[in-house]
């Protein structure tokens, strides 16, 4: 048995789904208000001054803080069933199925939020390591539980959950600099669906 590690946004999907999820789950008045508050940070992000993880943390805080956890989970379930399938690359699903037919362990390793990605992975019988939202007394706190699962954190999470040295071949699939450490773990690396050395 080998192991295949897949990034989600931009690798399995055609686009980043963080913002579409917030637009789907967050009430429109709060979304507009949050957009105004985040406008300077968005500009900084586009100029390369504000890191993506800082941008995501601020958007989570403004969009999801105080939301009922059960309601948020239901929104995540609906998003996974109604929106994600429209963004999934056919060849990505084919590759996942190819690995499963080989008897490989298939793990999605993503900075995407557990609140929706867990539903999609469960639906496709895939293991998951991803960014998790913190809750307290049935409400989302607007913070991540632990570090966002990007960059070096992807490698750390994989090593904490799996003995990668026990697998004859480790495959990894990614599409951005946030996947570099994930790709470095693998014998067979695919960046933007092209095999790289």
Predicted regions and their residues:
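Metal-dependent phosphoesterase signature
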Residues: 55-91
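C-terminal cap/substrate-recognition subdomain and adjoining C-terminal extension
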Residues: 1, 74, 81-197
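Generic structural signal for well-ordered secondary structure
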Residues: 14-15, 33, 52-56, 65
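Active-site neighborhood of HAD-like aspartate-dependent phosphohydrolases
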Residues: 1-48
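Short, compositionally biased "basic patch" segments
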Residues: 43-45, 54-69, 124, 128-133
